[in-house]
């Protein structure tokens, strides 16, 4: 653990030198971790600002694990660009995010999965108990972010054995925000978070050919994007076909990016 302004500055530089494209910090206590209360803030404001300065020097940004409104506001005021989780946000914190142009990446499916399988997979009892303190609040947080104009990206935060649940996040989001906004969170908004608009999250000339063909219209039925790809007849990444059940497309064909 890096401790102190000089130490966090060095740690950020080292991670960037090793190829990190973004820097993530812990700005509050967590759920899966049994020893840090979720209401605590972590890192001093000077430490956070030092990390942000190093990220900006490398033309990138800082994302912060944060749950409470206090931790969220504090991190954003110090220059953090993206909040991960953010379940316990309040209206004041959402306004701060909007004013600073910050994003949030909710990770709601992980709480359902941890509530179901956490104990079986070895999650400590204290951590299992924390899940319910943020599970419903996470769903409620979507309404707060939407009401205050905070853009939401797509995330899952699932542990290794739970990755099969990640697309269920679409269903949870759609129940509250509607199908279109659930899809935008994983396409155009995600591209904006990564500062790669026009390259990712869009279908246009010159963009990376990351494409799927869906058997049906997910604007009508978001469940078409859930599961294990049962309704995806074509998956293309960077112009290369990884899955193809379309009768009208040659699976060996590839697109050559300019």
Segments predicted by a language model, with ranges:
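C-terminal cap of metal-dependent C-N hydrolases
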Residues: 186-188, 192, 205-249
